[in-house]
Curated annotation (Swiss-Prot):
Keyword field contains Transit peptide: yes
Keywords: Mitochondrion, Transit peptide
Organism: Yarrowia lipolytica (strain CLIB 122 / E 150) (Yeast)
GO cellular component: a single term: mitochondrion
Protein name: Altered inheritance of mitochondria protein 9, mitochondrial
UniProt subcellular location: Mitochondrion
SUPFAM superfamilies in the record: Protein kinase-like (PK-like)
Annotated gene: AIM9
Span of chain positions assigned to the transit peptide in the UniProt entry: 1-36
Similarity field: Belongs to the AIM9 family.
Length: 579
C-alpha cells in the first residue's frame, strides 16, 4: 500500500492536473426554426437575424464572432483571431456545384437556397456550423480560426480530409461511420473566401460527451462510455503504415514522398486505393511553431521510429533558436529551456531501445487520433450506447507515429497517485470534505485509466505493452516535449528526466548508464525553479487554459464580483472576502 499524507496527495494531484490535457464541452445553439441565429454572450442568449440575401447586413457580423469564452487578458484580440467570416453566397455557390445523390451538379438556372445556418460548436481550432438547404439536405461546415500560419492550416486541412477518406475506406467498415466530405479547400481562393470543409451532418445523434461523467459512482456506468472509444482506438491501430508523419492525398505531397506507398499491403490493394494516399509532413502542432519552409525535413516524414523521436528534440531546439533570435521572449527563460532540450536531445535517442522494449511491433507506424475524446464520438440519440452505432468526427489532430507513443486518450489519462478504493487511504473518514472529494476524484481517474487499458487488452492485445508502467515512464519525456503549454513547461520535462534518472536502475532495472547528467548546481536550480513554477500555476486562476474562461462561468464569476474589469480592458480575479 502506498504511504499517505495530505501534502503529498495534493502535490501529486496538482501535478496530474497540470499534465492533463484539458478538453472543453461544446456549446450547442439549438436551431428553433430560425433562419439565422447566434448568442450574445455578454447579455445572455439573444437571437440574431440577418437576411441571407444581404451580404452587408450588420446583423450578420454577430454570427461570425467568437462567443464561447472570454480571456482574462487581451480578450478582444483573442476573440478577433477566432472570427470565422465567410461568404454565405459563396457557400450556396459551392453547394450548387455538388453532385446530388450521384447526379450531375444542379443546372445553372436552378436556384438553390441556404435556408438556415446554425452554430453547432466553437472548438479549439474550428467553428462548426450546420447548413440547411431548401432541398432538405443538411451539411456540416467547418471553418478554421485564423490561428497559426496559413501554411499550417493548409496542411492540417489537407491531411484531415485525406485521413477521413482513408479511415472511411480502409478502417471503419461496420465498426463506426465517418462523415463524407463533399467539398473542401485548403486555401482562401474559393467562393467562401476562407479555408473550409463541407461534409455530412449526422442528424439524430448526440456526442458521447453528453453521457460521460468521469466521476460517476458506478464504474460499470463509466466503462460503458469508455468502451466505444476503445473500439475506435483499436480499429485505428490496425493499419500499419510505411513511414511516420501524416496522411495526405498523393497530389498534396512532394514528388519524393509520392513515390512511397502509404501503408503495408498497398501493393496488393486495388490500384485506385493504393495510389490515393501518401505519408507527408506531420501536422503535430509542435513542428509548426516556427518559420520553416514547407518542405523542411524537420517535419518529416521519417523512415524509422528512432528518427521521429530524435526529431521531437530537434524541432524544439529549432523553435527556441528562433525565439532567441526574435528577442520577444524572456532571454533567461529561452536559455533555460534550450538547456533543458539539449539534455533531452541527449536522452531522446537512448530512451526507447528496441532490445529493451522487446516488442518490435510497438515501434511500427500507426495512426494516433490526438482528439479521441467523447466530444468527437457521436451516438444515436434514441438508443442505449451499447446498442448504438458510432460516428467519429474531427480528425484534425491525427498523425502517424510509433505505436508506443500514441498513449492513453487525454480524457482518461492520469498521472497522479494510483488509488483504487478509499480503503487504500489510512484514516479516510478523518479527512476534510475537500480532501475526501480529491481522493474520490483520484480513485475515479485511476479506475478510468485502468478500465481503458483493460478493455484495450481485450480488443488489441498486441499493443497492450505500450501501456506497461516501464514503457509509459520511458515515453513520458517524449509526450512532455511535444505538448508544452507554456515556455516554462520545460521545467516539467526537466523534472521528469531527473526522476527517470533516479529510478533508472532501482525501478526501471536498466543496466546501462543514464545518458544525461546534472551538476549539483543544476539540481538545486531545477528544484527551486520547479517549485516556483508550480506555486505560480497553483495561484493563477485559469492557468491551465491560459486565461480562457468558459462564457457561462465568466458571466457567473463577473456577476458575483469575483472578476473585475481593469482600465486596460483586462480582467482580474477578486478573491471572496472572508467572513
Amino acid at each position: 500500500m502506498q504511504s499517505w499524507n495530505s501534502q503529498s496527495f495534493l502535490s501529486s494531484h496538482f501535478t496530474m492536473l497540470r499534465y492533463a490535457c484539458k478538453r472543453a464541452v461544446p456549446r450547442l445553439n439549438a436551431a428553433s426554426g430560425l433562419r439565422f441565429q447566434s448568442s450574445k454572450p455578454a447579455d445572455g442568449p439573444e437571437t440574431v437575424f440577418t437576411s441571407l440575401n444581404e451580404e452587408n447586413d450588420p446583423n450578420r457580423d454577430a454570427f461570425f464572432k467568437y462567443t464561447w469564452g472570454t480571456w482574462l487578458k487581451n480578450n478582444e484580440a483573442e476573440r478577433a483571431k477566432r472570427e470565422t467570416r465567410f461568404s454565405i453566397e459563396g457557400l450556396a455557390e459551392v453547394i450548387k456545384s455538388l453532385p446530388q445523390s450521384g447526379k450531375a451538379p444542379i443546372e445553372a438556372e436552378t436556384e438553390i437556397k441556404v435556408t438556415q445556418l446554425a452554430s453547432l460548436h466553437e472548438g479549439k481550432h474550428h467553428r462548426v456550423y450546420r447548413v440547411d438547404v431548401d432541398d432538405g439536405k443538411q451539411y456540416v461546415l467547418r471553418i478554421p480560426y485564423g490561428l497559426g500560419s496559413e501554411l499550417f492550416r493548409k496542411k492540417r486541412i489537407q491531411s484531415e480530409v485525406a485521413t477521413m477518406d482513408f479511415v472511411r475506406e480502409k478502417v471503419a467498415n461496420n465498426k463506426f461511420i465517418v462523415p463524407e466530405v463533399y467539398s473542401w479547400n485548403a486555401t482562401v481562393d474559393n467562393p467562401l473566401d476562407t479555408q473550409y470543409t463541407l461534409m455530412d451532418y449526422f442528424a439524430g445523434r448526440d456526442t458521447l460527451m453528453k453521457h460521460w461523467n468521469p466521476v460517476a459512482q458506478e464504474m460499470t456506468e463509466r466503462a460503458a462510455k469508455i468502451k466505444p472509444v476503445v473500439d475506435i482506438y483499436s480499429a485505428l491501430l490496425q493499419p500499419e503504415f510505411t513511414r511516420y508523419g501524416s496522411l495526405y492525398f498523393t497530389e498534396d505531397v512532394s514528388s519524393k514522398d509520392a513515390s512511397v506507398l502509404a501503408y503495408k499491403g498497398a501493393e496488393n490493394d486495388k490500384k485506385e486505393l493504393a495510389d490515393r494516399w501518401r505519408i507527408g509532413p506531420t501536422t503535430e502542432s509542435r513542428f509548426w511553431k516556427n518559420s520553416l519552409p514547407e518542405d523542411s525535413p524537420l517535419r518529416g516524414p521519417w523512415e524509422t521510429a528512432e528518427e521521429y523521436i530524435e526529431a521531437t528534440a530537434a524541432i524544439n531546439l529549432h523553435n527556441l533558436a528562433e525565439l532567441a533570435k526574435n528577442g520577444d521572449r524572456n532571454p533567461a527563460v529561452v536559455a533555460a529551456a534550450t538547456a533543458t532540450y539539449e539534455k533531452y536531445q541527449q536522452l531522446a535517442s537512448q530512451l526507447l531501445l528496441r532490445p529493451e522494449v522487446e516488442n518490435d511491433n510497438l515501434f511500427s507506424a500507426r495512426m494516433g487520433f490526438g482528439d479521441l475524446h467523447p466530444i468527437n464520438v457521436l451516438v444515436e440519440g434514441q438508443k442505449d450506447i451499447a446498442e448504438s452505432s458510432l460516428a467519429l468526427v474531427d480528425f484534425e489532430n491525427t498523425s502517424i507515429k510509433p505505436a508506443l507513443l500514441i498513449g492513453t486518450p487525454d480524457y482518461v489519462r492520469y498521472g497522479g497517485l494510483k488509488l483504487f478504493k478509499t480503503e487504500d487511504i489510512p484514516n479516510y473518514d478523518q479527512l476534510s470534505d475537500q480532501e475526501k472529494a480529491q481522493v474520490n476524484y483520484m480513485i475515479a481517474q485511476t479506475q478510468n485509466a485502468f478500465t481503458f487499458e483493460f478493455l484495450l487488452n481485450n480488443e488489441a492485445p498486441e499493443f497492450i505493452n505500450s501501456f506497461s508502467p516501464r514503457v509509459k515512464r520511458l515515453s513520458e519525456p517524449v509526450r512532455l516535449a511535444l505538448n508544452p503549454l507554456y515556455l516554462e513547461d520545460h521545467l516539467d520535462l526537466s523534472e521528469e528526466m531527473i526522476k527517470l534518472q533516479q529510478d533508472w536502475t532501482p525501478i526501471m532495472g536498466m543496466e546501462r548508464e543514464f545518458p544525461v547528467h546534472w551538476t549539483n548546481e543544476e539540481y538545486e536550480k531545477q528544484a527551486k525553479d520547479f517549485a516556483e513554477w508550480n506555486q505560480k500555476a497553483m495561484s493563477t486562476p485559469f492557468f491551465q487554459t491560459k486565461g480562457w474562461v468558459p462564457q457561462d462561468m465568466f458571466e457567473q464569476l463577473f456577476g458575483n464580483g469575483l472578476l473585475d474589469k481593469t482600465e486596460s480592458g483586462d480582467y482580474v480575479y477578486v478573491p471572496p472576502k472572508k467572513e
